Regions:
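A short, Lys/Arg-rich alpha-helix, primarily the initiator
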Residues: 1-13
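Residue-level detection of the helix-turn-helix DNA-binding "recognition helix"
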Residues: 12, 26, 37-39, 66
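Short alpha-helical DNA-recognition segment
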Residues: 15-34
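DNA major-groove recognition helix of helix-turn-helix/homeodomain DNA-binding modules
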Residues: 26, 43-60
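Short, charged recognition helix plus adjacent turn
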Residues: 52, 62-87
């Protein structure tokens, strides 16, 4: 299953909103949205953060090929601070 669909399936399977998954993974809500719609590719760092937040292994979210492709040209992911996102 492609990463965007897989991420959404796992998130919804745990009845989490994008905002709650963002909070748990320390990623920005916009990053979650972009990953789920395929407008952003997952980096190895974001896959690990999301897997930890969902209580699954990184391999359950993304294939090594998906991560390697994204890591080649990945932009920095947006991390949350208490009040604002930073790069």
């Amino acid at each position: 299953m492609p990463f965007p669909d897989n991420l959404r399936r796992h998130r919804l399977g745990q009845f989490l909103s994008q905002a709650e998954l963002a909070r748990r993974s320390d990623l920005h809500t916009l990053t979650i949205s972009r990953l789920e719609t395929g407008r952003a590719k997952p980096s190895s760092r974001s896959v690990r953060a999301l897997a930890d937040a969902l209580g699954i292994t990184p391999g359950e979210l993304a294939t090594p090929e998906e991560v390697a492709e994204a890591d080649k040209g990945a932009l920095p992911i947006q991390r949350r601070t208490r009040d604002r996102a930073i790069s």
